[in-house]
C-alpha cells in the first residue's frame, strides 16, 4: 500500500526564505497562490501582458509581474499553464532565469515526462498535483481542511527536492488531507488514461451512446437525457462518498441486479482490449505526439471535433431542461 504523508511529515519553514512565483492565475493558479500566501510564504504571480487575471490577483493582495520578471525574482517557479503552451513560455521566459539552486515545479508531468521541457541539471524539478479543482483546493483550505495531493521528484539537484515539494504541498493545504509520493511517469500516464478511458472520453461516449439508443428507439429525448446524463451525478456522488459498494447499497435491488448482469455486457473483452491499446499509446508517447502536433498546426481537428460535439442534440435538450433546475440558477 502507498504511504500517505501529513502535516507532521512536512516542514513549511524550508520555504521561508524563498520567493514563490505562480505562473498563471486560473483555477489552480489562484488557489495555489492564495493558499501559499495565507500559509506565510512570499508569493508573486507571473502573467502575460494584458492578462485579464492580473486585476484579480492584485485585488487579492498579490504582486503581479510579467512571466520573465517573475521567473527572475523567484526561487521556486510553479508553472500552472495549459500543457500546450508550457513549452513556449518556458523556453522564452523562464529558462533564461533558471539559476543553480532554483526549483522548477509543475502540477502535471506531461511536459517533463514527454520531453517537451528539458530543464538544466542544476535545478530541482518537482511536482505537486492536487487531486481536485482549484476552487475546491481553495475552499477546503479556508475551512481548515485540504485536498489530497500527489508529489514527485524528477530531479533533485539540491538534495532537498523532496522536502521542498512536501513543504509546498503543505503550503497549499495538501498535507491536511494527505499527500502521496509518485513519479512524473506514473502521474502522467495514469492521469491521461483516466481522462481518456473513464472520466472524459469513456463517460462522454457512454452517455451519448445511451442517449442516442433511447431516442432512436422512439423515447422522448428529455427522458433519455434524465436517464443517461442527469442522473450520472447522483450515482457518482454515491461512489465518491463510499465506493461502488456504497452506491450499490443505496440503489434499488432492480438497479443493482441490472448492474451485475448487464454491466459486463457493456465493458466487454473487446472494450478492455481497447483500454489496453489506449494505455499503450499513452506509454509510447503516441498520444503526446498527436497532441503536440495538433497544437503546432493550429488545432484544426481539435477545433472541428469541439464544434461537432457542441452541436450534438443532447446539448440542446440539456440546455432546455437545465433551465428547470432552480438549484443551478442559484450558482
UniProtKB/Swiss-Prot annotation:
Q: What is its EC number?
A: 1.1.1.86
- Residue ranges of domain KARI C-terminal knotted in the record: 183-328
Q: Which domain of life is it from?
A: Bacteria
What is one cellular component GO term in this UniProt entry?
cytosol
Cofactor(s) listed: Mg(2+)
Which source organism?
Trichodesmium erythraeum (strain IMS101)
Q: State where substrate binds.
A: 252
Residues noted as binding Mg(2+) 2 in the record, renumbered to the chain: 191, 227, 231
Q: Which GO terms describe its biological process?
A: isoleucine biosynthetic process; L-valine biosynthetic process
Q: Which Gene3D superfamilies match?
A: 6.10.240.10, NAD(P)-binding Rossmann-like Domain
* Residues the record lists as binding Mg(2+) 1: 191, 195
Q: How is the cofactor bound?
A: Binds 2 magnesium ions per subunit.
What functional role does this protein have?
Involved in the biosynthesis of branched-chain amino acids (BCAA). Catalyzes an alkyl-migration followed by a ketol-acid reduction of (S)-2-acetolactate (S2AL) to yield (R)-2,3-dihydroxy-isovalerate. In the isomerase reaction, S2AL is rearranged via a Mg-dependent methyl migration to produce 3-hydroxy-3-methyl-2-ketobutyrate (HMKB). In the reductase reaction, this 2-ketoacid undergoes a metal-dependent reduction by NADPH to yield (R)-2,3-dihydroxy-isovalerate.
Pathway(s) it belongs to: Amino-acid biosynthesis; L-isoleucine biosynthesis; L-isoleucine from 2-oxobutanoate: step 2/4; Amino-acid biosynthesis; L-valine biosynthesis; L-valine from pyruvate: step 2/4
Name used for this protein in its record = Ketol-acid reductoisomerase (NADP(+))
Q: Where is the active site?
A: 108
InterPro entries associated with the record = 6-PGluconate_DH-like_C_sf, KARI, KARI_C, KARI_N, KARI_prok, NAD(P)-bd_dom_sf
Amino acid at each position: 500500500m502507498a504511504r500517505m504523508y501529513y502535516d507532521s511529515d512536512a516542514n513549511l519553514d524550508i520555504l521561508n526564505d524563498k520567493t514563490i512565483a505562480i505562473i498563471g492565475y486560473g483555477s489552480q493558479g489562484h488557489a495555489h497562490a492564495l493558499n501559499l500566501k495565507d500559509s506565510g510564504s512570499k508569493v508573486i504571480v507571473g502573467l502575460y501582458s494584458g492578462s485579464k487575471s492580473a486585476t484579480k490577483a492584485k485585488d487579492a493582495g498579490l504582486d503581479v509581474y510579467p512571466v520573465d520578471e517573475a521567473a527572475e525574482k523567484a526561487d521556486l517557479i510553479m508553472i500552472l499553464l495549459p500543457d500546450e503552451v508550457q513549452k513556449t513560455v518556458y523556453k522564452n521566459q523562464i529558462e533564461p532565469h533558471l539559476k543553480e539552486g532554483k526549483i522548477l515545479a509543475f502540477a502535471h508531468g506531461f511536459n517533463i515526462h514527454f520531453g517537451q521541457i528539458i530543464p538544466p541539471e542544476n535545478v530541482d524539478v518537482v511536482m505537486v498535483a492536487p487531486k481536485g479543482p482549484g476552487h475546491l483546493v481553495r475552499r477546503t483550505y479556508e475551512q481548515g481542511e485540504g485536498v489530497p495531493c500527489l508529489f514527485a521528484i524528477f530531479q533533485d539537484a539540491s538534495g532537498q527536492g523532496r522536502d521542498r515539494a512536501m513543504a509546498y504541498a503543505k503550503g497549499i493545504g495538501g498535507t491536511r488531507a494527505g499527500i502521496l509520493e509518485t513519479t512524473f511517469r506514473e502521474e502522467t500516464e495514469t492521469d491521461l488514461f483516466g481522462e481518456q478511458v473513464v472520466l472524459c472520453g469513456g463517460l462522454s461516449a457512454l452517455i451519448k451512446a445511451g442517449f442516442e439508443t433511447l431516442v432512436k428507439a422512439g423515447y422522448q429525448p428529455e427522458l433519455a437525457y434524465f436517464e443517461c446524463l442527469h442522473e450520472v451525478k447522483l450515482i457518482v456522488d454515491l461512489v465518491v462518498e463510499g465506493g461502488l459498494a456504497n452506491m450499490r447499497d443505496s440503489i434499488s435491488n432492480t438497479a443493482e441486479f441490472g448492474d451485475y448482469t448487464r454491466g459486463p455486457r457493456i465493458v466487454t473483452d473487446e472494450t478492455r482490449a481497447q483500454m489496453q491499446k489506449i494505455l499503450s499509446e499513452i506509454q509510447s508517447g503516441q498520444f503526446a505526439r498527436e497532441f503536440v502536433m495538433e497544437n503546432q498546426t493550429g488545432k484544426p481537428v481539435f477545433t472541428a471535433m469541439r464544434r461537432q460535439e457542441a452541436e450534438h442534440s443532447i446539448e440542446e435538450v440539456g440546455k432546455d431542461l437545465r433551465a428547470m433546475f432552480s438549484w443551478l440558477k442559484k450558482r
